[in-house]
Amino acid sequence: MENKEYTPGQNRPGRRGGMRGPGMGRGPAEKASDFKGTWSNLISYCKSYLPVVIIALICAAGGTVLTLLGPDKLSEMTKEIGKGLVTGVDMDAVSKIGFTLIAFYVCGALLSFGQQWIMATVTQNISKKLRGDISGKINRLPMSYYSRSTTGDILSRVTNDVDTISQSMNQSIGNLVSAVTLFVGSLFMMFKTDVIMTITAIVATLIGFVLMTVIAKRSSRYFVRQQRCLGEINGHIEEIYTGHTVVKAYNGEAQAAAEFERMNNNLRESAFRAQCLAGLMPPIMTFIGNLGYVAVCVAGAVLTMKGTIGFEVIVAFMMYVRYFTQPLSQIAQAAQSLQSAAAASERVFEFLEAKEMDDESNKTKTLDNVKGDVSFEHVKFGYDEDRVIIHDFSAQAKAGQKIAIVGPTGAGKTTLVNLLMRFYEIQGGKICIDGIPTNQVKREMVHSQFCMVLQDTWLFEGTVRENLVYCTPNVSDERMKEACRAVGLDHFVRTLQNGYDTVLNDQVNLSQGQKQQLTIARAMIADKPMLILDEATSSVDTRTELQIQNAMDELMKNRTSFVIAHRLSTIKNADLILVLKDGDVIESGTHEELLAKKGFYADLYNSQFDQAS
């Protein structure tokens, strides 16, 4: 009988990784709902780095200013050479200007390098701080937060969003300051040099940018469609991959291939249009620059023939036009990058500002030498205020007893154990361990009294030894091997290439039963005063189940044990069976007593054998 009552957004643990489904990639059109507010939060978060960032921005602006002085000096050099064509070139003056020009460019390059180095250092430190704060936040959030959020979404905030913030701050801020300085500075220098040629360059540039804006607007919808199609095809691949056995069993390969072909064609079409239009941008930028050069040359030639300007002005303007058009595209790219950073920051700060569990530093009560008496007194709980799952639950478990919790799907069995562990806080009544209410003791102390064996096994990428002694210090090899022998795992582990030092990864093929045996051995090694078992033997064969059951019976001696059982045949020897329905205890007693009552438990028990027959 299946028993997994619903909790909002529940994710099943036990997998060492996952595929990226739809929506994992950020599309180019994503924006923050509050751009100014989000950047204000980000700046406030990074305030300790602001003095260094300001120095980096000054370096960026200084390097750009020195670059802007280059054309003016080049104009002077051209003028000196022009005058020397008749009377002889003054090499001292030309050399002096040349060395000054080289000094400007070298200093500009050093300032630009300094800006890049400072920003790279700062952004990596900020990323490290963000990841550290998120990691700490994960441990302070209540379980209810995770029941409302998907694992992929939380992982995306730790990895993708933090990386987006880092890249945007490293590249966009410095580039934006440099681009704005270059744009304003080149415009100022052009007006300072000649107004007519400046207006000519601006008009020529505007014509090209109008064309670029039209194409950008048309291409944006194809980029959005491309991201949507990419998400669909990723989701389809994930579904087919995870359900590959079922697809094979039902001969669904042709149908899956046809669906993939349709999605693949849609992606190809949208990506082709998006990339074609995007591919027009570089030649358009080249066209804008060339158009500016042509306009400046024509206007300069006319003005030179009239004697209004000299040839050196045209030379300077040729460089100023490049400086004028170049930052416009950089500003647009930086603005888009800042939008992406704001969107990522919004998600990160939404997580960091989520309501945490109550601070328990002032709680002084402790659980010492726990015997294992547990009492539930008129407990009330609901995942939402308007959806109460447990209404008025009361029960008493004596130290060393084996308590079985049974009931139909959604009765509240797993929820009850979560409340006992203080994964969730009760809304009424109290739960006591040895007479001490659990809400008067720190959560960590409550957790330290239990070891758990869940239906969904959890193993991490580490050695067999590390998985067995997880968070249990000073475990001897003999104690570890004794636990493995008790669950019938020792022989299998010794057949592995490196025995207990074998790293558990995708190359080590463990059956579900072996994974479960490993987690049971972990619980035996932990040696806590109380146990929680959630259908611990549901995924193993009959022989292994009997072996594990005998080991668990030995482990549960003199320990209070709570067993969530879906197969009632496995709990006949329980000291007390609590029958839950709609969050309330409707029957309690031993197996024989409940069968004799011929009530709800008897119906559940008999229905399993009726289905088996």
Label every PLM stretch briefly.
Residues 53-111, 191-196, 307-311:
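Transmembrane helix-loop-helix hairpins at lipid-water interfaces of multipass membrane proteins
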Residues 2-4, 360-361, 367-613:
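ABC-type nucleotide-binding domain
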Residues 1-36:
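Membrane-proximal cytosolic tails and large cytosolic loops of membrane proteins
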Residues 28, 38, 46, 119, ...:
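Juxtamembrane loop-to-helix connectors within ABC transporter transmembrane domains
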Residues 84-85, 90-92, 189-203, 273-346, ...:
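Helix-loop-helix
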Residues 19, 40-43, 51-76, 97, ...:
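Alpha-helical segments in transporter systems
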